[in-house]
Amino acid sequence: MSSKGALIVISGPSGGGKGTVVKALMEMMPELGVSVSATTRAPREGEIDGREYYFISRDDFEEMIGDGEVLEYTTYCGNYYGTPKKEAERVTGEGRDLILEIEVDGAAQVKAKFPEAVKIMLIPPSLSELERRLRGRGTETEEVIQSRLARAVEEIALAPTYDYVVVNEAGDIEGCARKLIGIINAEHNRTCRMKEVIDNFTAN
C-alpha cells in the first residue's frame, strides 16, 4: 500500500456539527493528522503560535499565495485563513492521513491541486434540524441565523461535487464518526492506493 497518507477533506454548513464530529473522529483514530492553519488575525488570549494557528503578517501570507505555498485559503472578517502546503506535505509524508476541516471554497481548491483528495460533505438531516441547532447556540442574531441557513442551502447544493455525503443525525455523533472511519478505511483499499502491492506480484 502507498506509504503516503491521504488528504481527507471534511466540509459542511455552519451548525452541522463538523467540529464535534471531527473531534470524536480524532479520539477514535488518534493516528490521524490535523494540519495547523495560518492566519493574519491577531492571536487571542491563550493561543500559541504553531498550536492553534501560525500567526503571520498579511504581506507574508500574500507572498505564500503568490509562491504557491498555500494549499487552500479564504478571507473572513478581513483576515486570511489557509493551510500551508508544507504542513500538509509534512503530515502525509509521515504516512498519516490528514484531516482538513474546511469550507466548500477551500475544498474545491484542494481538489483542484490534489485530485486524489477525498471530499466528504457532512450535512444535518434537514434544514429544520440545522435551524434548531443554530438557535440552540443562543449566540447569534436572527439576521445571522437566516444568513447561515441561506448559506447552508448554497453549500449543500454543491454536494454532488463531493465523493461522499454523510448525514450527521441528531444525538449520534459517535455513529457519524464511525461512518467517516469506514470511508477512510475503504479509501485505503482503492486500486490506485494498492498499486505498490499489485506491482509486487507483477514485477517478475
Regions found by a protein language model. Name each.
Residues V21-V22:
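Post-Walker A alpha-helix
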Residues M1-L7, P30:
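Extreme N-terminal, non-catalytic leader segments
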Residues K18:
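Conserved lysine of the Walker
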Residues S11-P13:
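P-loop (Walker A) phosphate-binding loop of NTP-binding proteins
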Residues T39-L98, V104-D105:
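ATP-dependent small-molecule kinase phosphotransfer cores
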Residues T139, E154-N204:
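NTP-dependent small-molecule kinase module
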Residues L98-E103, A112-G136:
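Conserved phosphate-donor/acceptor-positioning beta-strand/loop module used by diverse small-molecule
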